Amino acid sequence: MKYQLTALEARVIGCLLEKQVTTPEQYPLSVNGVVTACNQKTNREPVMNLSESEVQEQLDNLVKRHYLRTVSGFGNRVTKYEQRFCNSEFGDLKLSAAEVALITTLLLRGAQTPGELRSRAARMYEFSDMAEVESTLEQLANREDGPFVVRLAREPGKRENRYMHLFSGEVEDQPAVTDMSNAVDGDLQARVEALEIEVAELKQRLDSLLAHLGD
């Protein structure tokens, strides 16, 4: 495929896509903002602990590949970054809002079921029902300039197939290692995680507001 990302590049791109929609008042992001987004403990799988230098290296690489661009100007002393991965003025990759939400969630969390994707992507796009989620996934799997996602074999004991993005190469279709979380219903767990993410976002906005008032 034309678009190939390493695991760290996928995390950076996913974070910028997410923040562009969920916290537009804080977008574009500074290096520190990208570090914080990459190392979030909510809506990230796996949870990472990247250093500023590691993130800066990814940002520099992605700028060279024209997947990001730097933004600076009057009154903007800190270099900030915005994504050009999709829906940019001169870019080839055009995605609908629903497709962006699903791709972003897959970049940030890896393989997931349609039910998990619907709950976890809700802050970026409100799917009307499961049929819309599944039809959007099928569109991404069958696009002429793709495919961008693939449906994986159903895991033992699971009701739904998982889907995975293909921006980091072919996916080894192997069941995940069983752990305690498998005992919890996937949809319910995803909803709880979505609420945790929303609380974290609200706390981040409150901290930012308090810091601004304190200046």
From Swiss-Prot:
Cysteine pairings via disulfide bonds: none
Keyword Oxidoreductase: no
Natural source organism: Escherichia coli (strain K12)
A Pfam short name: DUF480
KW Acetylation (keyword) present: yes
Top-level division of the source organism's lineage: Bacteria
Protein name: UPF0502 protein YceH
Residues recorded with modification N6-acetyllysine: K80
Protein family according to the UniProt entry: Belongs to the UPF0502 family.
Name of the gene: yceH
One term under GO cellular component: cytosol
Keywords for the protein's UniProt record, in alphabetical order: Acetylation
HAMAP family in alphabetical order: UPF0502 (MF_01584)
